[in-house]
């Protein structure tokens, strides 16, 4: 197991993947990380849809105009949903779950990239939420936060450069 300090430095967004499928045990570990993530008041107001059907992945990639076409090359997509009525912190809780999955994927040697869907859409005014809702039969009580593209890395990215950390953005006691 990788030490977290190293994992945090190594995890980068990957947008190029090989065609190799992801092992079912690895998918389960990734989802386990999400299910174990902390939530506001222990509500666990999120849902996750695991998509490995190539046609559905391609449709998800077209749910917004910009920044999602690379999803078509991923063997796996995980759609993160939340229930805004059940918990007003659904965005935060879903975000914590999503990054937990990304760190777990990195620990398994897999690449991932967050694709923002909440508040995004098509140039005709159709929201990504509406498009994804139609593809995956999502009920009205749930809202789409993001889609994670996950796969075996087709490219290598350098770890975060320690010298470029913005320590000047950290303040003690007061800004």
Q: Model-flagged regions — what are they?
A:
Residues 1-175:
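Acidic, surface-exposed loops and disordered segments
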């Amino acid at each position: 197991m990788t030490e977290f300090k190293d994992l945090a430095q190594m995890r980068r967004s990957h947008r190029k993947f090989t065609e190799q499928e992801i092992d079912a045990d690895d998918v389960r570990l990734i989802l386990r990380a999400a299910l174990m993530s902390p939530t506001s008041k222990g509500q666990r107001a999120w849902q996750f849809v695991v998509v490995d059907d190539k046609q559905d992945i391609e449709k998800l990639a077209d749910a917004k105009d910009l920044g999602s076409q690379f999803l078509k090359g991923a063997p796996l997509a995980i759609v993160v949903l939340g229930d805004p009525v059940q918990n007003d912190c659904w965005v935060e809780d879903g975000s914590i779950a999503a990054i937990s999955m990304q760190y777990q994927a990195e620990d398994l040697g897999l690449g991932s990239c967050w694709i923002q869907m909440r508040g995004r859409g098509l140039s005709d005014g159709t929201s990504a939420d509406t498009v994804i809702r139609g593809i995956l039969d999502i009920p009205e009580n749930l809202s789409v936060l993001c889609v994670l593209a996950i796969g075996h890395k087709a490219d290598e990215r350098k770890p975060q450069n320690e010298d470029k950390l913005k320590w000047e953005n950290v303040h003690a006691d007061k800004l």
